[in-house]
Amino acid sequence: MLTTKPCHCKEVLKLVLSPLTQHCLVIGETTCAFYYLLEAAAASLDLSDNYMAFLYLRKASSLLGQPSAFSFYKKHKVKICQFEEATFCCLRSEVCFNMGQITLAKKLARQALRLLKRNFPWTWFGVIFQTFLEKCWRSCSLSQPPDNPSENKKKLAVLQQQVQCLSLLWQLYNLEATASSRRFARLATLMQENSAKESASEAQVVSTYVALSQFSQNMGDKEKWLHCEQMAIQKNSLCWFSREGLLATAQLMQALAYTKLCLGHLDSSIRLGFQAREICRHLKKPALENLVLSVLFRSAFLKKKFDLCVHVLESQWALISEGHDVLGLACFYSACLDLLLYGKGWLCRPFGECLHFIQHYEHSCILNSQSNVMLGVHSSLAMWFAQDSQWKLFEHHYSKAHQLVKRTNASLFGSHGFVRFLECHVLMLQKMPEGVFAHTASETPRQTLKYFKEFFSRCVTCPVYHQWVSELKASVMRYGKRESMSLTNVIRPFDTCLTRIWIEGEFLEENNSFEGNLQRFVRVADVKENKDEEEIQECIC
């Protein structure tokens, strides 16, 4: 199946680009040295080595006459073209994004787009106006006849760089769960889609549709989510015979595994995940492979295949342990905590190691910007301390999770974190009469049920958790009537409920369409909400 040659970027970087850079610096060819530094930084990012990319860009910045990698001076010592300057800004934006410097990353991405003749607005009025232009003027420009071949080559490079900058922008704005950020993110995805179509590169179009599918799922837009995925599948048939096409195929298979997981098709998700991982290993794409492994773990975990979970985590550890990927390690330790809590004795990393990592890095810029991941981490830590009746530590991590829940979205990590938070909240409600909490305000079942309503309205594109959350909600309803609940059922939910969710067509049919399944879940959720509202009124009375 894999007919293209494997990637040799690491060898090229070590044996070609780095020596060429040093050679040009020694002989005083600063312009050439700057070019090779950009190439080396891009290769490092492609290999998921953000630290080396930062060092290359800092050296390139010094050639331009800037005292640091992230300051701005209009006059440069080295003469570079506008496209190279835009590439420089785009690479710095990506490095800042990976380092958690979100505001600076946005500024650099905007600067790169301005240099590429593609301005991105700053205000809500500008967003409205630019959206109108993208839907009208840009669609007209896509039908214009192509230029001569030499101009096309330059234009293609500019368009590809625009796509990269716009992809960074929507990911940056997607980290913030505000209405304003969502507007900016939606505009960035629209502009990215238009630039990708204008480039006429099938691989670029497929990658863009995969990205748009991911964004729509995060925003809870089920129709756009499945539409973009379907478009990516249709376009992907032309992409198999190139390296870029194979990478786009790997991205698509990862997205399909993600979708199958969100919808509850766990066996299909696992199968697609292993296929995507095979391509990632062939292409030597560690970042994408790590993402695939995260999806694989979650599918195996919900399927209750804990031996496979350990195997996946060991593979993930081999990928990220030698680098400086703090976010990757946070996702890894979050998965380890899940296995410790609900894995029935299976272990990958001890609790002390997980706790030490979180305590060491939780205040870093990188993790501060990742609310979805940290919500799950703090909620899992709270549940662990609850098992040992360490209520002060439970309260400490629960309060941190409580601050994060409003800042999350419908992504897989966001939905998973929300589920963990609901488990903590129900447990806290049950323990409240015992007076074990010193700094937490009293909660009523009615207040707790508001969180369940928010979950179902926000996480509509992640129905794999809906069954368990519905049962957890029912326990709150019963508690509101009887003022009694079993602590064991809250602490060990996977033993009774979650492991039964959508196993081999129990609630989902593997052959059903995505749209049909989602519509079915929406109808079920609506019925449950109506019934629950009636029961709430009974509790109040």
For each feature predicted by the language model, list its residue ranges.
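Extended alpha-helical scaffolding segments used for macromolecular assembly and cargo binding
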Residues: 1-99, 104-111, 160-201, 208
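Hydrophobic/aromatic side-chain positions at a characteristic register within alpha-helices
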Residues: 25, 32, 44-45, 90, ...
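Alpha-solenoid helical repeat architecture
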Residues: 48-54, 80-84, 122-127, 158-161, ...
